[in-house]
């Protein structure tokens, strides 16, 4: 990455209240710890409209607090602008990927590279499963996957 150049990443899941806000918060902490937060624009969004305006799921917030990470995101839906302004759009599962690819085809000048966040997992867990209908342990699994994937993503040359 050239000196002074700001890169951008948008984390996406179905509702933007479980997986993507966890990934966003984890990545924010990583770039802050590495003292490169001024080199990144970071956000998260949903493919659906189900949860727009809502805070992250309380179980995800509890999990993140346990790890000393605060979340202050409010759910929003992916916009056409996102495809033109973010360098990377990283999503959680095949359904997100399909929805994003379909939406990106309707956008002129899509500059975003759309990928699964799990593609960066050193443990090769490609899919980050939705913990919404699960329990605290499922949120912890999402957190652990996001830490592994976000670290690997941050370490790659951009």
Swiss-Prot record:
Subcellular location: Cytoplasm
Entry annotation: catalytic residues: 13, 19, 130
Alphabetized Pfam families for the sequence: LMWPc
Reactions it catalyzes: O-phospho-L-tyrosyl-[protein] + H2O = L-tyrosyl-[protein] + phosphate; a phosphate monoester + H2O = an alcohol + phosphate
Highest rank taxon of the organism: Eukaryota
Residue numbers bearing the N-acetylalanine modification: 2
GO cellular component, one term: cytoplasmic side of plasma membrane
UniProt entry keywords in alphabetical sequence: Acetylation, Cytoplasm, Hydrolase, Phosphoprotein, Protein phosphatase
InterPro entries found in the cross-reference section: LMW_PTPase, Ptyr_pPase, Ptyr_pPase_sf, Tyr_Pase_low_mol_wt_mml, Tyr_phospatase_low_mol_wt
Phosphotyrosine modification, residue list: 132-133
GO molecular function, one term: acid phosphatase activity
EC number: 3.1.3.48, 3.1.3.2
Family designation: Belongs to the low molecular weight phosphotyrosine protein phosphatase family.
Protein role: Acts on tyrosine phosphorylated proteins, low-MW aryl phosphates and natural and synthetic acyl phosphates.
Protein name: Low molecular weight phosphotyrosine protein phosphatase
């Amino acid at each position: 990455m050239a000196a002074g150049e700001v890169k951008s990443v948008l984390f996406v899941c179905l509702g933007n209240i479980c997986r993507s806000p966890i990934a966003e918060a984890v990545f924010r902490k990583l770039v802050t710890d590495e003292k490169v937060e001024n080199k990144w624009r970071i956000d998260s969004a949903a493919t659906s409209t189900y949860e727009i305006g809502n805070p992250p799921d309380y179980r995800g917030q509890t999990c993140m607090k346990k790890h000393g990470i605060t979340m202050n995101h409010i759910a929003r839906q992916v916009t056409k602008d996102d495809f033109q302004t973010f360098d990377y759009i990283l999503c959680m599962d095949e359904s997100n990927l399909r929805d994003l690819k379909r939406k990106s085809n309707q956008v002129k000048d899509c500059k975003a590279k759309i990928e699964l966040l799990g593609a960066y997992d050193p443990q090769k867990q490609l899919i980050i499963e939705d913990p919404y209908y699960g329990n605290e342990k499922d949120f912890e699994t999402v957190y652990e996957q996001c830490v592994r994937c976000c670290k690997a993503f941050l370490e790659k040359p951009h």
